[in-house]
Amino acid sequence: MGKSIPQYLGQLDIRKSVVSLATGAGAIYLLYKAIKAGIKCKPPLCSNSPICIARLAVERERHGRDSGELRRLLNSLECKQDEYAKSMILHSITRCVYLLEAEASACTTDDIVLLGYMLDDKDNSVKTQALNTLKAFSGIRKFRLKIQEHSIKVLELISTIWDTELHIAGLRLLNNLPLPDYVHPQLRRVMPALMEILQSDYILAQVQAVRLLSYLAQKNDLLYDILNCQVHSNFLNLFQPTQSGSLLYEVLVFAERLSEGRNAPHYHVVKWHYNEQSLHESLFGEESRLADRLLALVIHPEEDVQIQACKVIVSLQYPQDLRARPSSCQPSRSYFKNTE
């Protein structure tokens, strides 16, 4: 006689349990071996990887000694290298500057000069990495004046090479430096290029470009050049609610500074003439639709954008010089129709 069905099923359950137990035990054992091997595994002693450089920083701090890594990299940059090697060395130097603060501070202006030479390299990736390295060194006060000497060169690169990564690196560097007055003539020449970058489709580059333009809008001798700069017919698309919140915020800051600048007494008294396709006409002209865009941004999901949109509205309705006067004085023109 064969076994009954209940007996057969019972034995089948026992077999399944045994197999599961064995499989689970095997998996646990393999996991134990993997963890044990990982603990015993020693990383390579020397590497240019970010992990290795971070380890050098920890070791230096722990033992209070100079790792020599940054100096070794700078020295290797003076040797003849191909473009790829130079890019990798510069990338490693940048990381070292951020991680090994004491070693970076011990560098000299000669090192900054060496990095400046890299801006003349024929390869755009080398130029970009050199800009990133100079940006890292610009966080150390004693190097700022020396790095400022390269401002004109950086502006030239931004305006003559259409490369998004280079634009981002160059603009980040410029935004981290106080730009001296002697670069203002060059700034006027590159204004159209900055405006083109702002109107491109690369958010990181756009944000850096508009930050620089916002800074320059506070310079009395550059305000007209910015306002009279030619823009695309769809410039106000930058104020659409669908734009990135970070970009919207920076564009609104830019608009507020332009509005305050053009209404300042020393600027307002002059009869300025603007091109029909100028930034001024796009933002503040009779046919501008900026007011509609601003009202839509007042209900934007991001609070920073809401607040900044309100600031621009206030600056348009009540210019700074009029806000300082007695309440009996009214602005000559309103950008917003009366909804009563």
Swiss-Prot record:
Q: Which UniProt keywords apply?
A: Differentiation, Membrane, Mitochondrion, Mitochondrion outer membrane, Nucleus, Repeat, Spermatogenesis
* Effect on the protein of changing R211Q: In SPGF90; uncertain significance
Is the Membrane keyword given for this protein?
yes
- This protein's major location comes to nucleus
Stretches for region Interaction with TBC1D15: 1-101
In residue terms, where are the ARM repeats? 100-139, 179-218, 278-318
Tissue-level expression reads:
Expressed in testis. Highly expressed in the mid-piece of the elongated and late spermatids. Expressed at higher levels in neuroblastoma tissues and cell lines, than those of normal dorsal ganglia (at protein level). Expressed in breast cancer, colon cancer, hepatocellular carcinoma, lung cancer, pancreas cancer, prostate cancer, renal cancer and gastric cancer, but not in their normal counterparts.
Task: Cite the record's note on assembly.
Answer: Interacts with TBC1D15, TBC1D21, GK2 and IMMT. Interacts with VDAC2 and VDAC3 in a TBC1D21-dependent manner. Interacts (via ARM domains) with RBBP4.
Q: Which disease is it linked to?
A: Spermatogenic failure 90: An autosomal recessive male infertility disorder due to severely reduced progressive motility of sperm.
Stated role: Essential for male fertility and sperm mitochondrial sheath formation. Required for proper mitochondrial elongation and coiling along the flagellum during the formation of the mitochondrial sheath. Facilitates the growth and aggressiveness of neuroblastoma cells. Increases the EZH2 activity and H3K27me3 levels in a RBBP4-dependent manner, and facilitates the enrichment of polycomb repressive complex 2 and H3K27me3 on gene promoters, resulting in transcriptional repression of tumor suppressors affecting the proliferation, invasion, and metastasis of tumor cells.
Name this protein carries in UniProt = Armadillo repeat-containing protein 12
Naturally occurring in which organism (per UniProt): Homo sapiens
